[in-house]
Curated annotation (Swiss-Prot):
Catalysed conversion reaction: a phosphate monoester + H2O = an alcohol + phosphate
Coiled coil: none
Molecular function as annotated in GO: acid phosphatase activity; phosphatase activity
Entries under Pfam families matching the protein: His_Phos_2 (PF00328)
Entry keyword Transferase: no
Enzymatic class: hydrolase
Domain of life the protein comes from: Eukaryota
Active-site residues per Swiss-Prot or TrEMBL entry: H33, D313
Disulfide-bond pairs as recorded: C379-C385
InterPro entries xref list: Acid_Pase_AS, His_Pase_clade-2, His_PPase_superfam, Histidine_acid_phosphatase
Similarity comment: Belongs to the histidine acid phosphatase family.
Protein name: Putative acid phosphatase 10
Length: 411
């Protein structure tokens, strides 16, 4: 019998049940950065107009900082106040935060941490921060964010991967993809002339994402300068491009097998999410091994409780696709919203040593963190899922012998 009473009665950091003592041991989370400026110039808005959050293209806005701060507060509410799992102030051995090497993800992590560990009476002057009246905000203690190096590009999909380029060409032979791309090309041919674009019309892809950013701050300017622009056209662009975003991460509504037998959906998932899924499962397994060894564990994971990763919409979406729940992103344009987040909670039954996990999702900047474990197909409707099922998924998606070798296979 599974843990039907889970989280009805919370005892400290775990729950009691008929199956024994089930305790939360480890949490891994990943989130999309907060709202950003556009990535490209597009009339009538140019880089000089993007003054928010330091200014420039692709930068986190002040609103985006607030979105991430709110996510940090939600994390604090769950893991500090509700579960008594994390210390109320920063403890270096308990938490580890990582980011891709872009300003918007780095500052998103910093903003989140300001919500997770805000200035408080828990922070001690001259211990957690310098006591210099009028020169330092009382209680403000910094938390490090570790930025990915060039050797960590695979998990965040930033490594060059000729195999992925090959798979994108192969997917263009699929009827589902051809139909969706035809709609994109027709829309591009409608929009490009309005910007006086005469070459590369079929690949004029810049406008949907740019409109999304522009309308947040310059909606009146757009209506004044672009007499043909309206909300219906914006929505059409978002909806038309949404299937393409799904294909790029291995999400298809029909069997995605080419005429020569290549399973494009599986192959794309392997190179796009395989490394990330395996990192998550491997880290969780090592942590739970460490818990079972107790004092004999010398791993850095010995005291670590929370591992967070500040990344991008396509990274989060790729994991949702791998889990079989891409639909929960629930956005018009397909990919997860700003400040969307996935949480993996890993539990251990101290009597049976059974390992379990839960999946939680935060849909957007105005949403709460919601348990979606029962929606994950491999969990078959249960509220707590055996870790072995996650391990099986990792084994299936693992690039063999390694991602570098797989990425260099172009046939």
């Amino acid at each position: 019998m599974f843990l039907s009473l889970f989280c009805v009665i919370i005892v400290a950091v775990g729950c009691s049940s008929k199956d024994g003592n089930v305790k939360l041991e480890f949490v891994q989370a990943m989130w999309r950065h907060g709202e950003r400026s556009a990535l490209a110039d597009l009339y009538p808005i140019y880089e000089k107009d993007w003054v928010f959050g330091g200014g420039g293209l692709g930068e986190l806005t002040g609103r985006g900082m607030g979105e991430m701060n709110n996510l940090g507060r939600l994390i604090r509410e769950r893991y500090v106040r509700k579960f008594n799992f994390l210390e109320p102030k920063y403890a270096s051995k308990e938490v580890y935060f990582r980011s891709t090497n872009l300003n918007r993800t780095i500052i998103s992590a910093m903003s989140l941490l300001y919500g997770l560990f805000p200035p408080s009476l828990y922070d001690i002057p001259n211990v957690d921060y310098p006591f210099t009246p009028l020169k330092w905000l009382p209680g403000l203690a910094f938390v490090p964010v570790h930025v990915d190096g060039s050797d960590q590009c695979a998990a965040s999909q930033n490594c060059p991967c000729p195999r992925y380029d090959f798979l994108q060409q192969q997917m263009l032979t699929l009827p589902e993809v051809q139909q969706a791309f035809q709609q994109v090309i027709l829309l591009n041919r409608q929009i490009a002339p309005l910007y006086n674009v005469t070459t590369g019309v079929d690949t004029f892809y810049v406008y949907p994402d740019t409109w999304k950013c522009q309308r947040a701050y310059f909606n009146k300017t757009m209506y004044d300068k672009l007499p043909w622009y309206n909300e219906q056209l914006y929505s059409k662009a978002e909806i038309t491009y949404a299937p393409i975003k799904g294909f790029l991460e291995g999400s298809f509504s029909q069997p995605a097998v080419t005429s020569n037998g290549l399973d494009v959906a599986f192959e794309i998932q392997q190179v796009r999410s395989g490394v990330m899924i395996n990192e998550i499962v491997s880290r969780a397994s090592e942590k739970l091994n460490c818990v079972e060894r107790g004092q004999n564990c010398t791993s850095y994971l010995n005291k670590l409780k929370f591992y967070g990763y500040s990344i991008h919409d396509n990274n989060v979406y790729a994991v949702l696709v791998a889990l079989g729940i891409p639909h929960i992103s629930a956005t018009e344009d397909g990919w997860p919203s700003y400040a969307a987040a996935i949480f993996f909670e890993f539990y251990r039954n101290s009597q049976t040593n059974k390992r379990l996990f839960k999946v939680l999702y935060r849909q957007d900047a105005s949403s709460q963190i919601t348990d979606v474990t029962s929606q994950v197909p491999m969990c078959q409707g249960v509220s707590m899922c055996p870790l072995s099922t996650f391990q099986h998924l990792a084994d299936v998606l693992k690039p063999i012998p390694d991602i570098n070798t797989v990425c260099n296979i172009t046939s």
